[in-house]
Each structure stands twice: as C-alpha cells, then as structure tokens.
Amino acid sequence: MAVRYELAIGLNKGHKTSKIRNVKYTGDKKVKGLRGSRLKNIQTRHTKFMRDLVREVVGHAPYEKRTMELLKVSKDKRALKFLKRRLGTHIRAKRKREELSNILTQLRKAQTHAK
C-alpha cells in the first residue's frame, strides 16, 4: 500500500494513512491478529459471560417465550414464520430458532438429571 498524501487528485489522494498492523505475540511466534472490523459477529469470552449473566437475571422476551411454546409442541415451521416476522430476516429467525431449541434441550437434560 503506497503512502497517501493530502492531494485532491491522483491515485494517492486523500488523507495520509499507514497500514494497520495488528500483531499478537504468542511465546516466540508472531501471529497476525484480526482487524477490529473483522471481529464483527465473533463472540468473545467476556461478551458470552455478560450475555449469559443478563439472560439469567432478566429471562426471555415475550416473543421468545411464545416461540419456545411453539417448539415444545413441534411447530418448528410456525415458530420460524413467527420469528421471521419479529426479527425481520430469515437467517436471523433460523439462528434464533436454533438458539431457543438448544435452550429447550438443555432444560430437558437438566430435568432428567434432577429426577
């Protein structure tokens, strides 16, 4: 990447910039890290912990409770349609349905171990 100069025209127009270097040192090796913009949708340990803590304290939203009821009676397609209307996109709805079905399976496992 060429050094840019504060010119109004040409290939190097724009503000003076330098390449972002994000290098992590692990022991004796240099490992190239990820840029901040590439960390989108990657969950860190801290964010996972905080979200789990909030979920434990606050509980589920009403639409999530209704979806879990639909999943309990094996209405997966209806749950997907419901979530799609609430969340906006098909992919978000599928991800949420998967998340809620995993929560239901964990609850079932916890109930069987409690008996």
UniProtKB/Swiss-Prot annotation:
It holds the Pfam family Ribosomal_L36e. It comes from the Eukaryota. The keyword Nucleus does not apply. It is found in: Cytoplasm, Cytosol; Cytoplasm. Its main location: cytoplasm. GO terms for biological process: cytoplasmic translation. GO terms for molecular function: structural constituent of ribosome. InterPro entries: Ribosomal_eL36 (IPR000509), Ribosomal_eL36_sf (IPR038097). One of its GO terms (cellular component) is cytosolic ribosome. PROSITE patterns: RIBOSOMAL_L36E. The keyword Metal-binding does not apply. Keywords: Cytoplasm, Ribonucleoprotein, Ribosomal protein. Component of the large ribosomal subunit. Belongs to the eukaryotic ribosomal protein eL36 family. Component of the large ribosomal subunit. This is Large ribosomal subunit protein eL36. It comes from Drosophila melanogaster.
